[in-house]
Amino acid sequence: MYSDFLFNINQIIEENGLDETSNILSRFAGNRPFFALDSGITCNDIWERSKKILQCIEAIEDEDKQRILKSAIHFSAGIMPDYDSVENRFSLVENLENTIKDFKNSNDPFASRLIAIGPCGVDHDWESVEYEGRIHDYFDTQTIREEKDLFALQLTLGKKLDIPCIIHSRRGFSETADVLKAVKWNKGVVHGFAYSQSELEFFLNLGWYISFCGTVTYSGKKNFQDMIDAVNYVPKDRIIIETDSPYYAPIPLKCVRNEPLYVNYIYEYIASKRGVPKHKLSETVDKNIQKLFGLE
């Protein structure tokens, strides 16, 4: 009933182990979700993710929960920006294209469930941390241009393959907008939306769906009111909800590891802000996901 548009199974397993991840998925199955998407961060991690998530599901004793999860689980494949991916962007996106084609034509039980490219985009947060002795001053216009290139290459691949894309944008709206204007592929979701209403209007005018995660519940954030304004402004037919777990657990669980089950808190919070029943918001989100990805 309460779908989670995006979580990160490899990171959940890394933090919890396989056995506990099975328990996490079992708890999530109690939501009876229509949809759940596991996102990738490298060009060819889809094979490992598919294998691990199936292993975790089949370790659940309750066969009904297994059935629910096997029906709900979908995947994206994409390349998040970091030093190596930005530097090797051309070969990695070529690898990504081959991986998508090979996976979709394989005998993997989830072969038909790879439905999006991403998350991909512009993230200036990763530039501000020290990496191999290099700090923020290392970054210059060339680095930013190359990061935009990586994003543009993946959007172009989405356009070529007619696959929706999932945008990841952190403190990089202007660069994100530049790429979208240049590539002109506007089919997909802006995930973990963290901007204000003016930026929201830009994405909506291009046709993007907007997904919110637990950060909308963080009342201590400087841009909190901007986020609430955005939550209320998004049209009914464009709103989507995610956990982005294991990150960004919603209030009142901010200090614990996030998991897909906690999407319930985000539905409840956003429903209260929009003045609609929680179950009605869930139905709306499922319809939006179904329409965007052409799901039965």
List each language-model region with its residue ranges.
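Mid-domain alpha/beta scaffold segments of enzyme catalytic cores
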Residues: 1-296
